[in-house]
């Protein structure tokens, strides 16, 4: 009985570690009216210092919007700066904002991280 309980606890801890191992992005989806602001939040994998925001239009591959090394934006050449903005605080969480959002901004916005 004790061995079975120990195995169950070890399994639960392993599953919890696997669940928490990925990038966390919020919201999963967002529906807004035109001209309203929208913000996306990303928490990268712990220990990763490089963070990426991508935009993926319907039927196309992801396009890099901005890349951060720690807090510094090192490649933001594809970020439309008139209505889009991004920041990364303390080299951890990041936000991507669109204000005001236009119909043409309808897309999938993805966050990724790496060492």
Swiss-Prot record:
Residues 22-115 form the Ig-like domain. It holds the Pfam family V-set. V region of the variable domain of T cell receptor (TR) beta chain that participates in the antigen recognition. Alpha-beta T cell receptors are antigen specific receptors which are essential to the immune response and are present on the cell surface of T lymphocytes. Recognize peptide-major histocompatibility (MH) (pMH) complexes that are displayed by antigen presenting cells (APC), a prerequisite for efficient T cell adaptive immunity against pathogens. PANTHER family: T CELL RECEPTOR BETA VARIABLE 11-3, T-CELL RECEPTOR BETA CHAIN. Transmembrane segments: none annotated. This is T cell receptor beta variable 11-3. GO terms for cellular component: plasma membrane; T cell receptor complex. Keywords: Adaptive immunity, Cell membrane, Disulfide bond, Immunity, Immunoglobulin domain, Membrane, Receptor, Signal, T cell receptor. One of its GO terms (biological process) is cell surface receptor signaling pathway. Disulfide bonds join 42-111. InterPro entries: Ig-like_dom_sf, Ig-like_fold, Ig_V-set, TCR_beta_variable. Residues 1-21 form the signal peptide. Its main location: membrane. It is found in: Cell membrane. Alpha-beta TR is a heterodimer composed of an alpha and beta chain; disulfide-linked. The alpha-beta TR is associated with the transmembrane signaling CD3 coreceptor proteins to form the TR-CD3 (TcR or TCR). The assembly of alpha-beta TR heterodimers with CD3 occurs in the endoplasmic reticulum where a single alpha-beta TR heterodimer associates with one CD3D-CD3E heterodimer, one CD3G-CD3E heterodimer and one CD247 homodimer forming a stable octameric structure. CD3D-CD3E and CD3G-CD3E heterodimers preferentially associate with TR alpha and TR beta chains, respectively.
């Amino acid at each position: 009985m004790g061995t079975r309980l120990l195995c169950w606890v070890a399994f639960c801890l392993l599953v919890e570690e696997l669940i928490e191992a990925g990038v966390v992005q919020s919201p999963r989806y967002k529906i807004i009216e035109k001209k309203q602001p929208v913000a996306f939040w990303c928490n990268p994998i712990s220990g990763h210092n490089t963070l990426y925001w991508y935009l993926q239009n319907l039927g196309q591959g992801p396009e890099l919007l901005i890349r951060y090394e720690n807090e510094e934006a090192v490649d933001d050449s594809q970020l439309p700066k008139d209505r889009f903005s991004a920041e990364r605080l303390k080299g951890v969480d990041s936000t991507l904002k669109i204000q005001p959002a236009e119909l043409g901004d309808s897309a999938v916005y993805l966050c990724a991280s790496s060492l």
